[in-house]
Amino acid sequence: MDAKTDDSAGKCPFTGGGRRGHRNRDWWPEQLDLDVLHRNSTLSDPMGEDFDYAEEFKSLDLNAVIQDLHALMTDSQDWWPADFGHYGGLMIRMAWHSAGTYRITDGRGGAGAGQQRFAPLNSWPDNANLDKARRMLWPIKQKYGRKISWADLMILAGNVALESMGFKTFGFAGGRKDVWEPEELFWGPEGTWLGDERYSGERQLSEPLAAVQMGLIYVNPEGPNGNPDPVAAAKDIRETFYRMAMNDEETVALIAGGHTFGKTHGAGDPSLIGPDPEGAAIEDQGLGWKSGHGTGFGADTITGGPEVTWSQTPTRWSNYFFENLFGYEWELTKSPAGAWQWKAKNAEATVPDAHDPSKKHVPTMLTTDLSLRFDPIYEKISRRFLENPDQFADAFARAWFKLTHRDMGPKVRYLGPLVPKETLIWQDPIPEVDHVLVDDQDIAGLKAKILASGLSVSELVSTAWASASTFRGSDKRGGANGARIRLAPQKDWEVNDPAQLAKVLQRLEAIQGEFNAAQAGGKKISLADLIVLGGCAAVEKAARDAGVDVKVPFTPGRMDASQEQTDIDSFRALEPRADGFRNYLSGRQFMMPEEALVDRAQLLRLTAPEMTVLLGGLRVLGANSGGSEHGVLTKQVGKLTNDFFVNLLTMNTQWQPIADGTYEGRDRKTNELKWRATRVDLIFGAHSQLRALAEVYACGDSQEKFVQDFVAAWTKVMNADRFDLA
C-alpha cells in the first residue's frame, strides 16, 4: 500500500500546518458562556496558592523603587528616545490608560490587575507605543520581582513621573495584585478598531460602556467621529468621564493636568505603522506598531495622529495649559498624519521641539482641549484654575489619585507608607471597629432572639442577601459591611422590597438596641453584623427543617456607615438592573436575563457550581424579589431542600412560554399548572453544562451535599467584602 503523499497529512499543528477546529461557540454563538466564571484561577497563576502579595509588598523598599524610577525618567534609550529628554509624559500616559478603562456601571476595567499587559488592551489603538513604556519598566520589575506587581509598578511610574517634573502628588497606595490571563470584558459590539456602533438615538451611549469608540480609552481627540467641534466634543467628554466616576471639576483637572506634560505623536502617514503587539511578528517579541516613517521613533514617531505639544515647559508642572488655552485664538489645521488639531493664531514659536533643541513651535491644542474653553460649564472651571493655580494643582492631585485608585475598593486594602491620611467620600468609608466583638455565647443568644422575632426565613435571608450581594469584585465596592442597605439609595431600591426591608430592619434594630444596652465593657453588635447573622440563623433553621443540621460560619467585625459617609449618586451605580438570584429583572437591563445572572455571579466572584447551588437554595427559601413565585419549585418554601433541582429536571413537567415572557410548567398527562418560571430558572435545565451541575444536586443522595455547598457559597458572599479577614 502506497504511503500518503498529501502535504497536509501528519503536519504538526505547532509549525503552522495545523488548523484550529471549530469551538462550541462557533457552532452556537448564542450559547450562554460560563467561561467568565472560571478565569484567573490558580491553574493560570504561576505564583502558587500560598503567595501573599500584600506581605511581599510590605517587605519592599519602596524608596529604592522610586529612586530607580526617577533615574529611568531621564535615561533616554536609543531604541526609543525620550521626548524632551524625559520619559515622564510617556509614563503618565501609560498609568492613565491603565486606570482609565474603569467604568462605574459595573466597576470593571481599571488598573487593579495589570490588564494592560494583555490583549486586547495592549493592542488598542489608544494604547499605541505604551508597549515601549512597559519595556522601559522591565529592568525595574525584574529587579524587585514578586515584591511589586506590574499593576502597582505602572501606577507608581506615573506618580514618580509627575513628581520628577515638579508636581506634588496626593499619595500612592500599593495592593494591586497581578492576574495572569486577559479578562474577557464587553468592550463594545464593534468588530473593527475605532468603530462606533455603540450609539443609538441622539448619541445615546450603550451601557456599560464609557469610551466613545472601540479601542479608545475616553473620547476621540479630534472630536466626535473626527468632527473637530469642541462643543460637541464636550458632550462626549462629560458622558465618558461621568461613566468613569468623574465630575466636571475632576474632568477639567485631569485633562488639563495630564496635558501639561509631554506631547502627542503624528509625525507622518499612519498607514506606515505596522501591526499592534498581538499581531506583530514573533521576532518582534511583543513589540508592535513598528513604523516605516523615517527612523520610526524620536522625531518620526507616529502614535495616534495629532502632533500636539501643549506647554512651553512639557517636562515641568506649570499653568501654561490654561494660559495658552485662553491666551490665544485658535485655528483649525491638520497634523502631518492628517489628523485635525488646532494651532494658536498669530503666535510666536515658543514651544520646544521634542528632539531638536534648535527648533521651536507655536502652541497647539486638541479639539477636546478646546472643549474646556467653549463648553460653558467647563469654561467656568477652567478660568478659575487659570486664575488660581493652587486650586488647579490640588484638584489635579486629587483627581489623579482617584483615577488611579478608584477600582481598589476601601482604604483597608491600601498598602505602603505613601497612603494619604485623608479619607475620601469615593472610598466608601466605614468606621473602624470601636467596640468589643460578640462571642459564641452572644451569637447563639442573638440567633434565638432573631428567630423568635416573628421574622420569617424568607425575610431574613432576603435582607441578608440584599445587603451582601451588592458586592462587586471588579472595583471591590458594595457588600454587607457598612449596613448601607438601611441608607439611601439602597433602602429605596425596587429589588430590595422597601416595605419588607423597613420591617426587617426595624425589628433587627430593636434586637440590636436591647442587646447593646444590656452589655458592659464596651461590647456591641453592629447592625451590619446583625443583618448577616439573621440570614445565617435563617439558613440554619431552613436546613434543620429539611433534615440537615449545619452551622453557618459567622465572623463579627462589620461596622455601620453613616449617610454622610455615603455618596448617594455614586452608590446608584450599584443598583441591580437584574438579580437572577432573586428572579428580579428591571426594564433597564441590557442583557438577556440568563446573561445578567452570569454577569452578577462573576461580579460576586462565584464559580458555576456556586452560582447553581445558591440560586437553587434561594428559590426554595423564598428569597425572590417582590415575593414572586417564579422558580419557586417547591411546596416547602422556607426549607433548604433540593426541590428546585428535582422539580426542574423531572420529565413529568412540560414548559411553555406565555405572553409576559415567562414560562408555565404543566403536568404532561393532566395539563395541570404546576409551576411558573423565568429564563433564569429554565436555563439550568436547558444549558448542558448547567444541567450537569443541576443533576448533581437533584440526585437522591445529594440533600446533605446540597446544604453544605449552599452554606459554603452563602458564606463566601456574606464575607465577600471582609478584606480584614483575608
Swiss-Prot record:
UniProt source species: Chelativorans sp. (strain BNC1)
How is the protein modified post-translationally, according to the record?
Formation of the three residue Trp-Tyr-Met cross-link is important for the catalase, but not the peroxidase activity of the enzyme.
PROSITE patterns on file: PEROXIDASE_1, PEROXIDASE_2, PEROXIDASE_4
- Which classification does the entry list for the species? Bacteria, Pseudomonadati, Pseudomonadota, Alphaproteobacteria, Hyphomicrobiales
Record's function text: Bifunctional enzyme with both catalase and broad-spectrum peroxidase activity.
This entry's comment on the bound cofactor is: Binds 1 heme b (iron(II)-protoporphyrin IX) group per dimer.
Query: What does UniProt list as catalytic?
Result: H97
Binding positions (heme b): H259
- Any idea of its EC number? 1.11.1.21
- The identity of this protein, by name, is Catalase-peroxidase
